Regions:
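Short, basic, alpha-helical segments at the C-terminal edge of helix-turn-helix-like DNA-binding modules
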Residues: 21-28
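Hydrophobic alpha-helical connector segments
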Residues: 31-57, 61, 100-112
C-alpha cells in the first residue's frame, strides 16, 4: 500500500489502523438494545460467544488490540470512549431488565469480556494458560461453557 494513499485517505498510518479497529471492533459496533427478560440469558451468552468468534477469526484485530494498548492518542481515546459508552448502555439495559444490580453486571461483564480479549491475544502467541491451549477449539469451548455457567447463575 502506498504511503501517499494512506495519508490522502486516512491522514496517517495510525488513523488507518484506528479505522480498521472502529469497523471491526465488537464492542464499538454492538447494538445497544436488548430483548426482553425471557431472552436475556441467551442474549448475554450469544454476546460473549460472538466476541470469542470474532477474535478467533480476526487475527489482525488481535494484533491491533495489542498495538492499541501501547499508544495513547485522540483516535484511540475515541475508540475507547465508544466501547465504554456502548458497554455502559448494555449494562444499564441488562440490569434494568434482569433486576440484578448495575454494579454486579458491570463487574461480571468486565471480567468476562476482558478475559476473552486477553486469552485471544495470549492464545495468538501460542501460550498455554492454566493448562488450556487457546489455539485449540476445545479450550475455547471450555471457556464458553464456563461463561454460560456464570451467566446462568448471574441472570
Amino acid at each position: 500500500v502506498s504511503k501517499m494513499l494512506i495519508y490522502r485517505y486516512f491522514g496517517s498510518l495510525e488513523d488507518l489502523i484506528a479505522q480498521y479497529i472502529i469497523q471491526r471492533d465488537y464492542w464499538v459496533n454492538i447494538p445497544t438494545e436488548i430483548p426482553g427478560k425471557n431472552e436475556l440469558n441467551a442474549f448475554v451468552k450469544d454476546m460473549f460467544r460472538e466476541q470469542i468468534r470474532q477474535l478467533r477469526e480476526d487475527k489482525m484485530l488481535i494484533r491491533l488490540y495489542r498495538w492499541e494498548l501501547s499508544v495513547n492518542n485522540p483516535i484511540v481515546e475515541q475508540i475507547r470512549r465508544k466501547r465504554e459508552e456502548n458497554g455502559i448502555k448494555l449494562i444499564e439495559f441488562i440490569s434494568r431488565i434482569s433486576g440484578v444490580p448495575f454494579s454486579q453486571i458491570q463487574f461480571l461483564a468486565t471480567m468476562i469480556s476482558s478475559s476473552i480479549t486477553y486469552l485471544a491475544m495470549f492464545g495468538d502467541v501460542g501460550k498455554v494458560y492454566n493448562g488450556y491451549d487457546f489455539k485449540t477449539d476445545d479450550s475455547w469451548e471450555q471457556l464458553e461453557k464456563g461463561i454460560n455457567l456464570i451467566v446462568d447463575k448471574w441472570i
